């Protein structure tokens, strides 16, 4: 029975740097330190890092000369985690909220559905307005279209329809994007 390869977590992917003696197969490096940028031997770069009680961290291995920095790796990891956490906070996931209505909806029910749609659009979510026909209501699809167009018109100041309402079988659907 074979083992599954282990899944790397997000933090493992963030910290895939080689440090100190783990940097192998390199004779010369481009060293970035407080003194500036210099091309030195790997041993000299490691010695400088040890003298300053810091770590030699490989930042980039893409070029012919590997780029290394002399930094406190623990502090560097903490800063990267902090930046990553801040970036996640700033992300906003757009959800699609659905409002279901009927062709012969009462005015009070319509107002409540409209109010919910306004709240969703105010939060930055998309709203999918779907009007469903039952039985013989299909014969009066124009009545359903009027209700959907009325909803689009009432929500104009909160969002705009992606495209005109589409009748798909027994329902009419339109998606409204927030402004």
Curated annotation (Swiss-Prot):
Coiled coil: none annotated. GO terms for biological process: ribosome disassembly. Signal peptide: none annotated. It is found in: Cytoplasm. The keyword Protein biosynthesis applies. Keywords: Cytoplasm, Initiation factor, Protein biosynthesis. GO terms for molecular function: ribosome binding; translation initiation factor activity. GO terms for cellular component: cytosol; membrane. Pfam families: IF3_C (PF00707), IF3_N (PF05198). InterPro entries: T_IF-3_C_sf (IPR036788), T_IF-3_N_sf (IPR036787), Translation_initiation_fac3_CS (IPR019813), Translation_initiation_fac_3 (IPR001288), Translation_initiation_fac_3_C (IPR019815), Translation_initiation_fac_3_N (IPR019814). The keyword Cytoplasm applies. IF-3 binds to the 30S ribosomal subunit and shifts the equilibrium between 70S ribosomes and their 50S and 30S subunits in favor of the free subunits, thus enhancing the availability of 30S subunits on which protein synthesis initiation begins. Monomer. Belongs to the IF-3 family. This is Translation initiation factor IF-3.
């Amino acid at each position: 029975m074979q083992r599954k390869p282990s899944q790397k977590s997000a933090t493992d992917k963030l910290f895939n740097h080689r440090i100190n003696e783990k940097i192998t197969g390199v004779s010369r490096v481009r060293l970035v330190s407080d003194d500036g940028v210099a091309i030195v031997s790997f041993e000299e770069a490691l010695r400088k890092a040890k003298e300053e009680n810091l770590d030699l961290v490989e930042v980039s291995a893409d070029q012919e000369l590997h780029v290394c920095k002399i930094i406190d790796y623990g502090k560097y990891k903490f800063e990267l985690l902090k930046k990553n956490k801040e970036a996640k906070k700033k992300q906003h996931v757009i959800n699609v909220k659905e409002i279901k209505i009927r062709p012969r909806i009462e005015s009070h029910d319509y107002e409540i559905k409209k109010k919910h749609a306004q709240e969703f659009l105010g939060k930055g979510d998309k709203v999918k307005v779907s009007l469903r026909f039952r039985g013989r209501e299909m014969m009066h699809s124009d009545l359903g279209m009027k209700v959907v167009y009325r909803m689009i018109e009432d929500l104009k100041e909160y969002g705009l329809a992606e495209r005109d309402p589409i009748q798909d079988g027994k329902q009419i659907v339109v998606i409204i994007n927030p402004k």
